[in-house]
């Protein structure tokens, strides 16, 4: 009954604990990418208000398939972006928690991440784009967290 929310690696670990095999994605997702809420996700207390789609900050090169018995909530062009396990456990691939400072720090360290370099994103473009988008995305993240807290018994 305790609500769980796994983000990126945390989502991968939650999915793995539920029986999914975490694997390298076909390509890394770095930066801002569209995420489509599934029909099941439209009814979800966390992701439903984001339907039909939203743009999310991503920084991952691994993915997880839908664990047995899980409900698919969101997808990107590359991979599953979220699922619910049971009534109160969510595994998300995107980063609703990322702050402006964190995102800009990751972008500053871009060259140190071989997956970031090979994904073809230009950090000189990603930094300003993040500056433009992060405030709205932070509102989305805070609202998502409030909805998650409201699921607690």
How would you describe each model-predicted region?
Residues 1-41:
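Cysteine-nucleophile active-site neighborhood
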Residues 23, 38-153:
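Amide-donor transfer/coupling interface in amidating biosynthetic enzymes
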């Amino acid at each position: 009954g305790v609500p769980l929310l796994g983000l990126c690696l945390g989502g991968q670990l939650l999915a793995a604990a539920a029986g999914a095999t975490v694997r390298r994605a076909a390509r890394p997702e770095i930066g801002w990418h569209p995420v489509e809420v599934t029909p099941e996700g439209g009814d979800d207390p966390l992701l439903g208000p984001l339907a039909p789609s939203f743009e999310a900050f991503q920084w991952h090169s691994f993915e997880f398939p839908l664990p047995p018995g899980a409900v698919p909530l969101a997808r990107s062009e590359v991979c599953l972006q979220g699922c619910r396990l049971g009534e109160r456990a969510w595994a998300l691939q995107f980063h609703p928690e990322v702050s402006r400072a964190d995102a800009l720090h990751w972008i500053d360290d871009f060259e140190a991440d071989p997956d970031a370099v090979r994904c073809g994103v230009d950090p000189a473009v990603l930094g300003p784009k993040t500056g433009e988008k992060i405030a709205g995305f932070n509102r989305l993240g805070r609202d998502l967290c409030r909805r998650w807290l409201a699921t607690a018994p």
